[in-house]
């Protein structure tokens, strides 16, 4: 079901060279993913460049990398993942495993890239589909494309968290750039954090020169989007239907003109840096908190 998969109770894999895999999915059970860990304590470290390509036909649920349970995966070189042909496919997919003894979800941890590297996720469906787990992307360039760029879903009675963190200049190009969700119970959340900290600091005058760009809609009835550190971030597209929390903690964030360009339903907390917008407009559910 998978190109490479770890399923034992304890499995460690270390690859010092390049990892280059290409697969074609011809049926629903042909490939669950190109590379995966689904066990209690599996670890994988790839120090060289990683290139994964999967071609499939709709409606197969194709995945480039998949991780569940207590999986721990690190990719230290350039990372390129392409999953094409499936609207429900994912370049990167994570999910929790329910532990009956603790009555809580066990979530995987994945890191892609390091300083100076490039991370590219390209999918006909989801760039990142995080339904439980911690995902971090680091590099001098991070690009995500798909029908949905980043999907995060946490919470519920299983105490599941779903977090995605970008430590590098990031571009998300997708009709649905960011979608956040929390299951029933809302005990633990879902978050997307832009944390690029450039040296030297780039202080853009216009949104076109921002370090990171989100090109597409931002939606979700819950969840959190964080802007941290000194980098800059620009939103393009409709963000008016995001009803979660946006935390402006550092750097500069640019919004767009018109009602679609504002977090009109969200709760905004500005505790550092600058939030740049032509005007601010809130609906009944909107709220603005300023510090300082």
Pin down the residues of each PLM region.
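Glycine-rich beta-solenoid repeat tracts in large extracellular/virion proteins
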Residues: 2-9, 28-39, 43, 60-70, ...
């Amino acid at each position: 079901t998978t190109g490479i998969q770890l399923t034992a109770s304890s499995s460690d894999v270390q690859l010092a060279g390049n990892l280059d895999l290409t697969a074609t999915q011809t049926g629903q059970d042909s490939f669950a993913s190109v590379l995966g860990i689904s066990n209690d304590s599996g670890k994988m470290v790839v120090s060289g460049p990683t290139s994964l390509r999967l071609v499939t036909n709709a409606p197969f649920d194709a995945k480039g990398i998949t991780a569940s349970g207590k999986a721990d995966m690190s990719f230290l070189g350039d990372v390129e993942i392409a999953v094409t042909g499936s609207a429900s496919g994912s370049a990167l997919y994570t999910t929790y495993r329910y532990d009956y003894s603790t009555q809580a979800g066990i979530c995987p941890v994945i890191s892609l890239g390091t300083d100076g590297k490039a991370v590219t996720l390209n999918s006909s469906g989801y760039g990142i589909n995080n339904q439980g787990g911690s995902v971090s992307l680091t590099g001098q360039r991070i690009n995500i494309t798909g029908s949905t760029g980043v999907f995060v879903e946490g919470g519920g009675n299983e105490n599941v968290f779903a977090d995605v963190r970008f430590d590098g200049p990031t571009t998300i190009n997708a009709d649905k750039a960011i979608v956040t969700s929390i299951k029933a119970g809302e005990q633990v959340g879902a978050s997307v954090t832009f944390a690029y900290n450039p040296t030297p600091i780039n202080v853009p005058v216009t949104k076109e020169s921002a370090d990171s760009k989100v090109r597409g809609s931002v939606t979700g009835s819950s969840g959190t989007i964080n802007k941290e550190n000194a980098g800059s971030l620009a939103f393009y597209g409709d963000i008016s239907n995001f009803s979660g929390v946006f935390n402006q903690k550092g750097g500069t964030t640019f919004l767009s003109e018109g009602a679609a360009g504002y977090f009109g339903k969200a709760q905004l907390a500005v505790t550092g840096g600058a939030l740049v917008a032509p005007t601010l407009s809130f609906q009944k559910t909107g709220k603005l908190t300023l510090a300082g």
